[in-house]
Amino acid sequence: MSQYHTFTAHDAVAYAQQFAGIDNPSELVSAQEVGDGNLNLVFKVFDRQGVSRAIVKQALPYVRCVGESWPLTLDRARLEAQTLVAHYQHSPQHTVKIHHFDPELAVMVMEDLSDHRIWRGELIANVYYPQAARQLGDYLAQVLFHTSDFYLHPHEKKAQVAQFINPAMCEITEDLFFNDPYQIHERNNYPAELEADVAALRDDAQLKLAVAALKHRFFAHAEALLHGDIHSGSIFVAEGSLKAIDAEFGYFGPIGFDIGTAIGNLLLNYCGLPGQLGIRDAAAAREQRLNDIHQLWTTFAERFQALAAEKTRDAALAYPGYASAFLKKVWADAVGFCGSELIRRSVGLSHVADIDTIQDDAMRHECLRHAITLGRALIVLAERIDSVDELLARVRQYS
């Protein structure tokens, strides 16, 4: 049995030689730690020609950006690996491939995606991937349908819910999405110039009631195996290709949470574009983001309904019209969770580069205010925003 220890670059090379499935493992000779996240070590492993051939990822027993004062379970590495394996089974073209996982070392070896780029960076740089939103919608439809009650036998579904219980990581989501932004908390992070805006969130009874309802749905609705953190920084893109990574927040939850998080990150980019590109040049890019959102949702909904028509196993759920009615509830959830993502990324612990890298302070603060204002509107008006076209109209209204 392996004993947990924090990997060095040398350890990563030795491990990849053993488990990366390379024809000539001795060709793997060096590694570089490239992780920029908060929870893990990530190594690129290179061959003698300097070509990256594999990724070695190890969970740390604490939140990296905070330190050992915020401990974390290492079991999240098992949950991430098993989530990605399950998602790969249903959407191999859009999920990173896991070659090997060791639960004792909390380490996995996965395919190298050096020919891809992190989508967030490409969005900020205004590099457009016209197929990405459709591919993301297809990924979400495939993995969420095939792990839902529409497809799984009830016994299998209940067993999987138990397998993917993820209380430690869900607690982080519960705090960062639904608690911290609406109270005074040391984890919150925002410029002093936004103090009045953030205080208004804390004093907004209508908003806090709506957030409570969202949190309750996050607690109680085990609809499908979520990615749990499907933002533009956990998606790799290339010409004609999209791959989801980083699923340590995977658990069975409300389908609208993944949809809303994905849409929310496109809207965060939308909010930040005037600061990144200038007001004049941002106009066309903003329209692309809104088109991305439309394509993401319509692709997801069409694929999910087609899968439901073809593959639903439960007689009651297969009744004509039920899948469509279910998706209306998913959409309402998605709009609310989208608003939560906008707010928590603006005032909470973990921000996004789409806005944080804006050099001009006044413009950055204005973009943050835009995200906060839009986020609040989406949360409190979610039940009235009954279509993707209505969502886009609301976004334009708050621009």
From Swiss-Prot:
EC number: 2.7.1.100
GO molecular function: ATP binding; S-methyl-5-thioribose kinase activity
InterPro entries: Aminoglycoside_PTrfase, Kinase-like_dom_sf, Methylthioribose_kinase
Catalytic activity line of the entry: 5-(methylsulfanyl)-D-ribose + ATP = 5-(methylsulfanyl)-alpha-D-ribose 1-phosphate + ADP + H(+)
Keywords in alphabetical order: Amino-acid biosynthesis, ATP-binding, Kinase, Methionine biosynthesis, Nucleotide-binding, Transferase
Residues binding substrate, per UniProt: 229, 344
Sequence positions that bind ATP: 40, 57, 111-113, 246-248
Pathway membership, UniProt: Amino-acid biosynthesis; L-methionine biosynthesis via salvage pathway; S-methyl-5-thio-alpha-D-ribose 1-phosphate from S-methyl-5'-thioadenosine (hydrolase route): step 2/2
Entries under NCBIfam families matching the protein: MTRK
Family: Belongs to the methylthioribose kinase family.
Protein name in the entry: Methylthioribose kinase
Provenance organism: Klebsiella pneumoniae
